[in-house]
Design a protein with these regions (language model features):
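Histidine-anchored nucleotide/phosphate-binding helix
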Residues: 60-75
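C-terminal motif of bacterial Sec signal peptides marking the signal peptidase cleavage site
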Residues: 13-16
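Short, glycine-rich nucleotide/cofactor-binding loops
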Residues: 42, 49-62, 89-93
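Short internal beta-strands
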Residues: 68, 77-84, 118-122
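Bacterial Sec signal peptide processing site at the extreme N-terminus
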Residues: 18-29
Length: 160
């Protein structure tokens, strides 16, 4: 008997939860269907691309930057470079080419044109002997607050 009561209560709660998200409102003879909170308040998700590879792995680097360009069409994007990746974004950095990918310079220019945040790790820069003034135009020194403030939605991370 307790099992049947509990099962009935569970069905009742589930049904109530389902209906709570699908109400209609009638205002001035206009019927508006109100959905669940997540469907009415859709926030733009963010893509966090982490690049620790450098010139030793052009496939990884250029794939990550190409993904950043593609994702920036409808997502907030932040590119973070550390370890060997910081070597790619200096004024003295050489261009990189790999198979059918656009070059490093082309991809960085596309990201700059789309106003995508590209940050370099300050500790990794220091270890490699670089300073903030060595960064290419448009590249900034990483700031911890920007890791979370670049988007209002969820953050998806891709690691290269």
């Amino acid at each position: 008997m307790k099992k049947i009561f509990f099962l009935g209560l569970l069905v009742l709660v589930f049904t109530a939860c389902q209906q709570a998200g699908n109400k209609t409102a009638n205002v001035d003879n206009i019927t508006v269907k109100t959905g669940k909170v997540d469907s009415c308040c859709m926030l733009k998700d963010g893509i966090f691309l982490h690049i620790s590879s450098g010139y030793e792995n052009p496939h990884k680097v250029l794939m990550a930057l190409k993904m950043a360009v593609m994702m920036s069409m409808d997502k907030d994007v932040l590119v973070y470079l550390d370890i060997k990746g910081v070597e790619l974004v200096m004024k003295t950095s050489k261009d990189m080419k790999f198979k059918d990918f656009p070059t490093l310079y082309e991809l960085l220019d596309q990201l700059a044109a789309k106003k995508v945040i590209v940050m370099a790790c300050p500790t990794c820069m220091k270890v490699a002997g670089y300073k903030a003034e060595d960064l290419r135009p448009g590249i900034i020194v990483a700031e911890k607050d920007k890791f979370f403030n670049f988007t209002k939605g969820r953050i998806v991370t891709l690691d290269y």
